[in-house]
Amino acid sequence: MGEFNEKKTTCGTVCLKYLLFTYNCCFWLAGLAVMAVGIWTLALKSDYISLLASGTYLATAYILVVAGAVVMVTGVLGCCATFKERRNLLRLYFILLLIIFLLEIIAGVLAYVYYQQLNTELKENLKDTMAKRYHQPGHEAVTSAVDQLQQEFHCCGSNNSQDWRDSEWIRLREARGRVVPDSCCKTVVAGCGQRDHAFNIYKVEGGFITKLETFIQEHLRVIGAVGTGIACVQVFGMIFTCCLYRSLKLEHY
């Protein structure tokens, strides 16, 4: 009877080992995906980040990059702990899983909270940022972001082309009589912003506030979904780890 129980325990341990190994392979790939999403958020349209008053969006992306890197290291550690049957490594592995789980939950919550606040933040800050920082010394990133937004999303101004009347740059001599930046033009040539002509200036209502809000919200949905989804999958990893740890403890005795 004792021999039967021992074989049963050993068989269960072997099954758990292979199950946890398979999980760790998938977990490593998931870590790569999480890190890729974080890097994608930072790299793709990174100039737009300079237009945001809050650092929440940036913090969320950095958390994902860090979490993804730690996940990949943890996946390798999990494979070593599983096949070497070292309970101390399994304990460390479980603690790392728990830390990553909390990081991804935090990233998901930050993404959700910022998603709710985004519209208010853009309306309160973007027009003022555009008026006071566009083409001003030390704010080249803002200038580049605004020009890129207007050309890519075919719009002019934060709400409409009239917003540029409040621009400090427009009132300066270096603007050379422009009423809007050249990036507002459908066909961009030097000095085309000197005439607010209906046929060559984008007149889309809603301006780039609406476009930028939609763009960032799409990114936040991806960040929130990836962070929360993989965090939920990690629960299974922690359960498998606890089961294997307990099984090794029983075999030890």
UniProtKB/Swiss-Prot annotation:
Membrane-side (Cytoplasmic) residue stretches: 1-18, 79-91, 243-253
Compartments reported by the entry: Cell membrane
Free-text description of this protein's post-translational modifications in UniProt: Palmitoylated. Palmitoylation by ZDHHC2 regulates CD151 expression, association with other tetraspanin family proteins and function in cell adhesion. Ubiquitinated by RNF128 on lysine residues present in the tetraspanin amino terminus via 'Lys-48'-linked ubiquitin leading to proteasomal degradation.
Keyword Iron applies: no
Record InterPro entries: Tetraspanin/Peripherin, Tetraspanin_animals, Tetraspanin_CS, Tetraspanin_EC2_sf
Extracellular side: 40-57, 113-221
One annotated Gene Ontology cellular component of this protein: plasma membrane
Glycosylated residues, chain numbering: 159
Topology relative to the membrane: Multi-pass membrane protein
UniProt similarity note: Belongs to the tetraspanin (TM4SF) family.
Name this protein carries in UniProt: CD151 antigen
